[in-house]
Amino acid sequence: MAQKDHPNGPKKSASASSKRWMYEHVNDFYVKEATKKGLRSRAVFKLEEINKKDKLIRSGMTVVDLGAAPGSWSQWAVDTVGLKGKVIACDILPMDSIAGVDFLQGDFREDAVVNALLARIAGHKVDVVLSDMSPNMTGTVGIDQPKSMYLVELALEMCKEVLVKEGSFVVKVFMGSEFDLFMSEARKCFKSVKTRKPDSSRSRSREVYVVATGYKG
């Protein structure tokens, strides 16, 4: 449920920074690789690298993917869990269907959407919760970081509802004033909590991925 790239988000005139971003994007190695492999975005390589290091997602698992659009994480996850596994995805934005992925469109900040997602899970526990959610960015850290942390905290609350004991959680976090507090909260719930900065994450970006394993239940 990527609050990212929302069609109603703030519109900015073409600036030097946006032109630089576009130049880097079209010349980006990971963008080219994703296009060549028929994947929906370069973000897939972040999850692939994290999973290679931490071995979180395996055949037969059930995975919840929050902030799923345009779908590259769900694509990768459903291929990895195979026919005996399950992927349930959610995003505020529409997402083209992916075979084997149960997709719910809605705003994860709304109780009705969370309840609908829980209904899709149908009382079963899941092995991994993924969250690549991000708010519409204004460029003002004092606004963007709290909005981002709110989504991170909602994803952690979802873990408490649905994760199997010893389950795992991967969440995108933007470094800022509330980061240490979130890490402290995550450590109360998981045996191991670490940060990852995948090679495919742009170096200028303040994003990191928190990888939490061994859910205490």
UniProtKB/Swiss-Prot annotation:
Which top EC class applies here?
A: transferase
What are the GO MF terms of this UniProt record? Answer: rRNA (uridine-2'-O-)-methyltransferase activity
Sorted keywords for this record are: Cytoplasm, Methyltransferase, rRNA processing, S-adenosyl-L-methionine, Transferase
Q: Where in the cell is it found?
A: Cytoplasm
EC number(s) of the enzyme?
2.1.1.166
Kindly state which reaction or reactions the protein catalyses. Answer: uridine(2552) in 23S rRNA + S-adenosyl-L-methionine = 2'-O-methyluridine(2552) in 23S rRNA + S-adenosyl-L-homocysteine + H(+)
The UniProt entry annotates the active site at 172 (proton acceptor)
* Positions bound to S-adenosyl-L-methionine: 71, 73, 91, 107, 132
Q: What's in the GO CC field?
A: cytoplasm
- Which Pfam family, any one, appears in the UniProt record? FtsJ
- The lineage's top-level taxon is Bacteria
- Report the protein's function: Specifically methylates the uridine in position 2552 of 23S rRNA at the 2'-O position of the ribose in the fully assembled 50S ribosomal subunit.
- What PANTHER family would the database entry show? RIBOSOMAL RNA METHYLTRANSFERASE, RRNA METHYLTRANSFERASE 2, MITOCHONDRIAL
Q: Which family does it belong to?
A: Belongs to the class I-like SAM-binding methyltransferase superfamily. RNA methyltransferase RlmE family.
The protein here is known as Ribosomal RNA large subunit methyltransferase E
- Origin species, per record, is Psychromonas ingrahamii (strain DSM 17664 / CCUG 51855 / 37)
Q: Write the lineage as a comma-separated list.
A: Bacteria, Pseudomonadati, Pseudomonadota, Gammaproteobacteria, Alteromonadales
Its gene name is: rlmE
